[in-house]
Amino acid sequence: MSCARVWVCWYFYGQMSVPFLDLAQVNATFEPVLSSVLTQVARGNQLIRGSEVEAFEREYAHHVGTSLAVGVGNGFDALHLIFQAYLSLGRLRPGDEVLVPACTHMATILAVKQSGLRPVPVEPDIDSFLMDPSHAETQLTSKTKAIVFVHLYGQKAIDQRVLDLARKHNLLLIEDNAQAAGCGKPGERTGSLGDAAAHSFYPTKNLGALGDGGAVTTRDPELAQLVRALGNYGSVERDQFQWPGFNSRLDELQAAVLRVKLKRLDLDNERRQTLAARYLAEIKNPQVILPTVVRDHVWHLFVIRHEKRERFREALAAQGISTMVHYPVPPHRQLALADWSTSSLPITEEIHRTVISLPLNTALTDHQQEKIIRAVNQVQE
């Protein structure tokens, strides 16, 4: 079975007895409450930056453990607006270097690049996939002014070593929390550990909207105020524009959805952790490299590695198991980052060459997971 065939099977679900993700089923469990709140919002007069957005910002900031949250259009905008705000405040300057994970989704890097800053790739740890602080320190120059840690796949990327590194070198510490909503204990959650954090509420995320959405969290009132203004065309007061801003605002409908889902986020993350624990305990295939858990994890994705990835995926697909790859092409091999094409990043390339994501979500049943585990253990060469 070709890679294209695997994708078609996943997209139409019907040919896969275990889909990678059934969003309809995930959202069905919220349906009665969502129908009520969406009807209520639709009958109102203010659909942009109204009472639902204000309430969600308060509730989300409280859940994360920061004093402030600003709703924006999506996760990319959240990160981009953080950089734009720091530039406007003079805490960053055009051309400054920002350390970023070499192993991440392209959005992290593009947000830096499109802000007029210079992203510098840092190799990950091969076992956790997270940026290695010891590698980061070797990339520091006099132009390095910020560092972005991505809580990749749902695992907390920041520990005391990271905090010490940022403090020692006076770096802005920015979190990409797109994949780790609710990760960590209260008071230690991702999104509250750095100077500012970007959050995504894309529908597939642990806290997913019914469309696009994002947020910035911080304890810095000046930064939050500027992010809010920049996301509203650079305006604080109607028809008065203090900065050349953008259009990036969380709407009332999505905020209402997120308020409903936020109430169950911790419980949903516990279910993800239960599913992940079973995978870790019961997958015994010696050809499968299981993920290493070094810190708190909420399992946005359950990512294994296999030396013969495509053959393994095809064999699983033949048994009705849908899988995906996050991500097949490393950022430094993308045309959009042609200036990185000569970078030597062997750990990143090894990870991107071998990773496979198994189904893991709140709609996955115990029976479906049993079938996945059985298939994974059977497919050996």
What is the role of each PLM region?
Residues C3, W7-Q46, S51, P359:
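N-terminal "arm"/small-domain region of PLP-dependent enzymes with the aminotransferase-like
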Residues D127-A209, A215-T217, S357:
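Active-site phosphate-binding strand-loop segment of PLP-dependent enzymes
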Residues P32, L92, R272:
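Pyridoxal 5′-phosphate
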Residues S115, K168-H169, Q319:
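Helix C-cap/helix->beta junction micro-motif
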Residues Y13, A24, V53-R58, H63-V70, ...:
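PLP-dependent aminotransferase class I/II
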Residues C103-I109:
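Conserved coil-to-alpha-helix start sites within the AMP-binding
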Residues R118-S128, M324:
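Short beta-strand->loop structural element characteristic of the AMP-binding/adenylate-forming
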